[in-house]
């Protein structure tokens, strides 16, 4: 799925997502001290704007220019204080983020393809500064049964799940949350996602 695919998908609707921040982010990041955040697969910017509104300096990254333009427009509407805290960046994960640059790396419901050498994933892990937080939220695979019935080519094993990432973390990390739990927000329209899988880990060094 390339930039053209996602641009077309965003153009197919006036708004693809709700514009609200994801529940996992709100629950897990509300108590963190604001700093520098990387929002991976930011879409139309709901999470980025929530973070910026709480004092974070946010780098919001997505492959879709259409999504980024919508996010930037929403930031402008939210006011200069919020808009000035977000940098909207078009990139895919072949572009490695700068190491140690972020106090929070957040990846919410982003389909990150699993790789034998974990190159893209390790780039994201390296982007977390010592003392910073990695936060990943995903749909529970048990809720995907109906989707798999309609899309038999879909292979969930082709993508990292939060628990997969937890197993790859070394002793330079402290895992604080690694669990499956009920969603705190309504699932996307037309889906049956009722549980989230969540990983929150703190980089020690």
Residues of each region from the PLM?
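A short acidic, Gly/Pro-enriched loop at the edge of an enzyme's catalytic core
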Residues: 96-104
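Class I SAM-dependent methyltransferase SAM/SAH-binding core
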Residues: 44-94
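A short SAM/SAH-binding and catalytic strip from SAM-dependent methyltransferases
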Residues: 103-117
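Conserved beta-strand signature within the Rossmann-like core of class I S-adenosyl-L-methionine
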Residues: 131-139
């Amino acid at each position: 799925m390339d930039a053209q695919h996602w641009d077309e998908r965003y153009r197919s609707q006036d708004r693809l997502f709700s514009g609200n921040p994801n529940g996992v982010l709100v629950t897990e990041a509300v108590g963190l001290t604001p700093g520098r955040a990387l929002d991976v697969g930011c879409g139309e910017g709901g999470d980025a704007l929530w973070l910026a509104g709480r004092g974070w300096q946010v780098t919001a990254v997505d492959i879709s220019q259409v999504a980024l333009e919508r996010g930037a427009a929403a930031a402008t509407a939210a006011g200069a204080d919020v808009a000035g805290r977000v940098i909207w960046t078009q990139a895919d994960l072949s572009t490695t983020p700068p190491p140690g640059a972020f106090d929070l790396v957040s990846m919410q419901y982003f389909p990150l393809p699993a790789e034998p050498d974990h190159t893209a994933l390790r780039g994201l892990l390296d982007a977390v500064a010592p003392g910073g937080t990695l936060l990943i939220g995903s749909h529970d695979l048990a809720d995907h049964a109906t989707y798999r019935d309609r899309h038999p080519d879909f292979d969930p094993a082709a993508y990292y799940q939060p628990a997969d990432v937890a197993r790859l973390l070394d002793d330079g990390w402290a895992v604080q949350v690694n669990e499956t739990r009920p969603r705190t927000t309504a699932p996307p329209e037309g889906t049956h996602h009722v549980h989230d899988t969540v990983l929150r880990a703190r980089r020690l060094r």
